[in-house]
Amino acid sequence: MSAFGGSGKPDLQPAPASASRLMPAGPPQPALVAQIGTLHLRLPIAQSRVTAVGFQGGSAGALALSPLGTQRNQGVVQRVVHAIVGSSSSGPGWYQLPGGQGPSTSALEVGAAAGTDVYSPVDGTVLSIENIVLNGRIYGSRLDLQPTGAPSLIVSISHIKIDPSLVVGSPVAAGASKLGSIVDFSGAEKQSLARYTNDSGNHVVIEVHPAAAPALG
């Protein structure tokens, strides 16, 4: 999978969510936020709309991602080590969040106000679209993509209202194809990202899972 974007170092700072932030901002500028092997994940939201970026444990089976920025809430030991050996700073600053299952960086959360446009983090094809139902209520959907350059992986994007133009089989382009918009998840759970934003912490979630092995027989 080819890397998307250049070598710029966007400085993303938590920003308040106001009515003006709900106006369409268009696609994000090229910026990589994480990777796993040769697969790079591009920032899915316009930089001016991002409130914070966080990583936490993902759902069952989610794979560990490598953040491409500097952890903003690292401990004293980590700060000393990074001061000596350096750290990755090519991506946006991020926060380690509690909770989830599996590796502590297996879920990427990119915060923005509900209604903010979300774009594809990879080139690929839509594999499935499923509603997220909690306590009998639908809170957006989960979209699974098969990355063009990494067919053995599945990129899952959730906490979004799917764009009606997308169907199973639709091709998507990193940073150019709109997947949908962020849903208001504040009524479903207390969101960890809210600790680092000036709002309820709404966000899009991105995870990477192994693709299911084909059945033999």
Residue ranges and their predicted role:
Residues 107, 119, 127-128, 173, ...:
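Hydrophobic beta-strand signal
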